[in-house]
Design a protein with these regions (language model features):
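N-terminal amphipathic alpha-helix/helix-capping segment at the start of soluble metabolic enzymes
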Residues: 1-19, 67-72
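Glycine-rich phosphate-binding active-site loops on the catalytic face of alpha/beta enzymes
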Residues: 117-120, 196, 242-261
Length: 558
């Protein structure tokens, strides 16, 4: 077990994205920054994910300003981190190497220290370019292996077994994840992250996986998870006991629930084990003072009401309640003895005492991401077909296996979920399966997202796409976004520099109106600044008044 544990703080990116729809304004971020400089986190995740899109779409702010302002405030005390989807970067389409290189260079020049790179299919080919360019410009390549689980197949009847029918063999074994990590390390990864976006990894699994990864690669291992199904805190405790190098946490008011575990609960556990986090908890307490108010502001602006919050707690000044102390001791003992059932019960009891959200049992039992489930519900509600939700859920394993068993992470989780709903609707209407297909599902089966963990049956691909051969996305067909001149802004270009061009390429639907509005305002301000002031105009008019009256022809007095 390591005696030093590094902390990556997620509060300003994943934390606000998971709990507050990524609506934290620049002004709110800046209220926390003086204290972040003193906190000495190993890393701070502040960019990527939904942040660049949301700050333009909802806040009318500049994504590059967000990154650069945090760098200016924090300096080199903590490494700033962003989340990138491999060849898709922050967008959803595969980009050319020219765009990937420009994006990596500008990100690092603007203050980024670590790029966390993942691919929704765990297709290593999709992350090669980003790794190369991040390292070329002096950044740290944090390569993530997306954790996912095998489908829950229906139980076979005795008759099925007699006939020799078998469910598919497991694909997402520990060896699968270790193999991916070794491939990434060979490409130049500087660290490996177990990225559990859905919070589905239980403590016993992460304990085994951390040990195997530590034995297989010589670079640091990070663990990222969420608390939605209730495993998060216990799994972080198990990973720490297994010797993980870095864990991802949120500050108290943004911790738990759909987010990552609260740092303070990790701190209490590590205190018992004599593990140093290298974090100034006094500065963290000051961050939390700001975040408490910001949490309330976001609840009002985003949800229209204050949501239940955990009890206030500062481990430096508040006595640890006796009930929590007992559960912490139980958790430490259980983690050391690998009694994972007891560890899970103790961790959940600690969170319950402080009032963090209870585990989402539906997500836990279905073993699918919470966002995937909620999107399926929304799709069926829009169609007034909520009655087929159970059947849609039953079809997920079938649809997923047919499509090559993609990991259930963004965007493949949404693609599989939407297609399962389509299949259930087809079935209800008496149509054959896959009569209704969404374009993203067709592209996934065709191969445009990359190689799936399991090969797609060529006949199924022909049924869905009209071709039997796997066909990857043709980067040579990529067309850059138009960059017109704006007459309403004095004829300037929509994107005037490389950073603006990158925003336009990655987020065309959002960046176009954002940049147009930005240029119009700048032009209007320039026009207003150069226009004569009203008082000057009046004075000039007064001077130019014609002289009237009778002219006297007489010498002036001496």
């Amino acid at each position: 077990m390591a005696k030093v544990l590094k902390i990556r703080d997620l509060t300003l990116r994943d934390g606000q994205q998971s709990s507050f729809a990524t609506r934290m304004t620049q002004a709110q971020v800046e209220r926390c920054l003086p204290f972040y400089k003193d906190a000495h986190f190993f890393a701070m995740e502040v960019w990527g994910g939904a942040v660049p899109d949301s700050v333009m779409r909802y806040l009318n702010e500049n994504p590059w300003t967000r990154l650069e302002s945090i760098k200016a405030a924090v300096g080199d005390v903590s490494k700033l981190t962003a989340l990138s989807r491999g060849r898709n970067l922050f967008g959803y389409a595969p980009y050319t190497d020219e765009i990937i290189e420009g994006f990596c260079r500008n990100s690092i020049e603007s203050g980024l220290g670590i790029m966390r790179i993942f691919d929704c299919l765990n297709d290593v080919d999709n992350v090669k370019s980003t790794i190369k360019y991040v390292k070329k410009y002096g950044g740290i390549a944090d390569c993530a292996v997306c954790y996912t689980v095998d489908p829950k197949y229906p139980k076979l009847s005795l008759w099925d077994k007699i006939k020799g029918k078998k469910n598919p063999a497991p694909v997402f074994t520990d060896d699968y994840f270790v193999s991916k990590a070794k491939e990434l390390a060979a490409l130049g990864a500087d660290m490996i992250t177990i990225k559990d976006m859905s919070g589905l990894i239980p403590p016993q699994r992460v304990s085994a996986l951390v040990k195997k990864l530590k034995a297989a690669v010589s670079i640091p291992v990070d663990f990222h998870t969420h608390c939605t199904p209730g495993y998060g805190l216990a799994s972080v405790y198990a990973a720490i006991a297994a010797g993980v190098d870095v864990v991802d946490t949120n500050c108290w008011w943004f911790g738990g629930g759909t987010g990552a575990p609260a740092l303070e609960l990790v701190y209490l556990f590590c205190q018992k084990l004599g593990i140093d986090l290298g974090v100034n908890m006094e500065a963290v307490a000051k961050i939390n003072e700001s975040l408490k108010d910001i949490r309330s502001e976001l609840n009002t602006s985003v949800f229209g009401a204050d949501k239940p919050a955990p009890k206030p707690f500062n481990p430096l000044v508040d006595a640890v309640p006796a009930e929590v102390e007992a559960e912490l001791n139980r958790a430490v003992k259980a983690a050391q003895s690998e009694d994972f059932a007891t560890l899970l019960a103790a961790a959940q009891a600690i969170e319950a005492y402080f009032g963090f959200p209870a585990p989402n049992k539906l997500v836990q039992e279905a073993e699918i991401p919470g966002g995937m489930y909620s999107n399926m519900v929304a799709q069926l509600q829009a169609l007034k077909a909520e009655d087929i939700l159970p059947r849609s859920m039953e079809l997920i394993p079938t649809v997923r296996l047919s499509a090559g068993l993609p990991p259930l992470v963004t965007p493949t989780s949404q693609i599989v979920g939407a297609q399962a709903v389509n299949c259930a609707l087809d079935e209800k209407a008496g149509r054959p399966m896959y009569h209704t297909k969404n374009n993203q599902f067709v592209n996934l089966v065709k191969g445009e997202y990359g190689k799936t963990p399991v090969a797609v049956d060529p006949e199924f691909r022909f049924q869905i796409c009209g071709v039997r051969e796997e066909t990857n996305y043709d980067i040579s067909k990529y067309q850059q976004q138009p960059n017109p001149e704006l007459p309403e802004a004095g004829g300037v270009k929509l994107a005037e520099n490389e950073k603006e061009v990158l925003l336009l390429e990655l987020f065309p639907l959002v960046a176009k109106p954002y940049l147009t509005n930005l240029k119009k305002k700048a032009y209007e301000a320039t026009v207003a600044a150069t226009a004569p002031k009203a008082e000057d105009t009046a004075a000039a008019a007064e001077v130019k008044q014609p002289i009237t009256g009778k002219t006297v022809l007489a010498p002036l007095p001496g």
